[in-house]
């Protein structure tokens, strides 16, 4: 076990456990934020903080001032420092498919805080001494500061601690009105990756510190609140879906229980609310009237009055001019589908050509990253000079590994994006054909045309990202080779009997070289990743525009509510912009731009003007594009579950 520094022993003297945890947590948080850039996008951070506050309202440790932040690394991870500092990585947000997945994982990390797992793990590690040095102002280098933050990512939790955190995470998600099956969805993604037998590099940290096993998934699947086994549990989750404008998801849950409890009036009223939200006015009225006649008229009568006051819109068939324009655009959409297939072929060929060098880089990175685990599990107190050098090596090797994570994520993201573009292109073609024959509704043409345009721009960006990635592979491989060579000196540093001054000098020189190579490679890898990320955003904007076009007019008020939830704005604001002719994808860009610049959303709308692709006008900074990608991903996936897209066999929301 690590021997405590004299300064730490003095620090702990007379302190209660909360005081120690608070001081260690504060020092660790400072280390994390010195190591990784914190995302400052207002839209993303408001959402992250809102979700965190909603969950921690159900924490049994209310004395902890929880804070939630996003850090900029393509590594897939989420972690909690002592005293409620909860971090998710940009890579994790890119990897997660839904808001419910993120909520459940955030709840899991809050569970580690609730059970004090972080401080327990720190006490088993050299990091406890390092954090104490920060508290006592004994730190002399940035390396010492960053080591604690990097070390936090390599702390290991026991199987029992992971089980308990899973329980807390799903229970909190359920209590907050989210679907706790989000954790099962996240586990399913991990399981799929592991089944491939080639776990991606960017998952290594998550799988190392939070070991996944099928038992974790099966254990949560057996929890009654996770599977909505009873009417009350289904109703609680459905209420959350109603509040987020996901009326189809709510209906699916409620319909499954309605036959079991036909006399449950609260369930019947929630069903009516869900039907009203989806624009099924006649059926909703019938259920409200039935509930009113059964002796509880107050709410049903209010709901009926609101429906009379705010009737649902009625779809108007496309005009003859719109039909003719749609027919003319079918050829463009078909050409887009062919072009997307060509893009897929070119991306696959480029990735195959890069594979040998990238695989070699992964191997060198994996070997070098063994240092992180070595540092977290060391059971001896190192001399101060040796400790500092080991810390700096740790930081340099981690920086080099980050470049591999970035290129791996760029490739994965590009493959997924081009596959989605191909499917959305086919759906746009089907919708345009329908419009040309008098199907769909008036106003859908402009939205479908916008979707085709965004898909074309997305394909262009994917090819540019591929070219940038190709240029980054060589520098990335050089950085990993340097990191591996540097890490070879770790064993000598930990052996106090063998270490010589010449070893320390050489280790410092190699560390400097690794850091410089990592910085150069990272600059090129980030260029590729930023293009792939923007390509993904444009593909998702196409989904939103197409879903808006495909939705019957009566569904639009309900979809306004969904958009407002994810964009953290008012339903009335969304409806007003929609009435001005903007699509849901347009509105997402406007809101992100307004939040990032501090201007009014209406002013952004005036500046952009109807008919102009917003991303051709808006210059989103890096944070803004990352935040927009996350929120648009969750929104587009939720909307695609509500709206039957053209060419889709059936509406998955029911």
Task: Give the predicted meaning of each segment.
Residues 2, 12-314, 318:
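A Zn2+-metalloprotease active-site environment signal
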Residues 19-28, 122-156, 198-204, 333, ...:
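Glycine- and small hydrophobic-rich membrane-insertion segments that are intrinsically disordered
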Residues 309-539:
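Extended amphipathic alpha-helical heptad-repeat regions
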Residues 502-506, 510, 519-654:
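General marker for long, soluble alpha-helical cores
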